[in-house]
Amino acid sequence: MKIDILTLFPEMFAPLEHSIVGKAKEKGLLDIHYHNFRDHAEKARHVDDEPYGGGQGMLLRAQPIFDTMDSIQATKPRVILLDPAGKPFHQSYAEELALEEELIFICGHYEGYDERIKTLVTDEISLGDFVLTGGELAAMTMIDATVRLIPNVLGKQASHQEDSFSSGLLEYPQYTRPYDYRGMKVPDVLMSGHHEHIRLWRMEQSLKKTYLRRPDLLETYDFSDEERRIFDSIKSELSEGEN
């Protein structure tokens, strides 16, 4: 995968050179290029200007972005604009991006964008209902979430297939050594070696955690018959506990 990032602050992306993203680059699975669009700005390297019609703040000018995009060699890239007014970023979207060969991220700053910049864009994406100073942190988050899904980046394919949200549910609790730490013991079922009992326990725990913490995820979740029976039992148990 090839990723190009348009930003005023390339140095902010230094953390991407480490951990999973750095390993993906070392394996030759990822190529990242940073483009400071101030280098393409006319008018004394100014990248922002006042909005027509008045208003608060400054807008990112179209010219530096267009000229930077013209300088990037890409055949058919997915162009992502980081914008708090964009569609929310989800795990399923990261899975979709992981299938692409070329991604371009445009990181804004200031009050907003000249609307004409959006003619270059295929996707307008937001991390959530809050506003950041710039798009860099959002881009890094999205890149990290996407790159780890590229085949062969992680050691085991199953290591991300069982992540929270990958199945549509939150992940079940997990434990490692020691068995007993400060009086807190690993559930007996995980020590039993009975794979079917462990599978059912994990399914129950995943459904229960999702129901208690993110019930909205269950509104669109496609339950199997087995999951539906377990989920109904969970709700009944919790309801009895409230009475």
Curated annotation (Swiss-Prot):
Its EC number is 2.1.1.228. The keyword Calcium does not apply. InterPro entries: Alpha/beta_knot_MTases, tRNA_m1G_MeTrfase_C_sf, tRNA_m1G_MeTrfase_TrmD, tRNA_m1G_MTases_N, tRNA_MeTrfase_TRMD/TRM10. One of its GO terms (molecular function) is tRNA (guanine(37)-N1)-methyltransferase activity. It comes from the Bacteria. Disulfide bonds: none annotated. GO terms for cellular component: cytosol. The keyword tRNA processing applies. GO terms for biological process: tRNA N1-guanine methylation. It is found in: Cytoplasm. Keywords: Cytoplasm, Methyltransferase, S-adenosyl-L-methionine, Transferase, tRNA processing. S-adenosyl-L-methionine binds at G108, L127, G128, D129, F130, V131, L132. It catalyses: guanosine(37) in tRNA + S-adenosyl-L-methionine = N(1)-methylguanosine(37) in tRNA + S-adenosyl-L-homocysteine + H(+). Belongs to the RNA methyltransferase TrmD family. PANTHER family: TRNA (GUANINE-N(1)-)-METHYLTRANSFERASE. Homodimer. Specifically methylates guanosine-37 in various tRNAs. This is tRNA (guanine-N(1)-)-methyltransferase. It comes from Streptococcus equi subsp. zooepidemicus (strain H70). The gene is trmD.
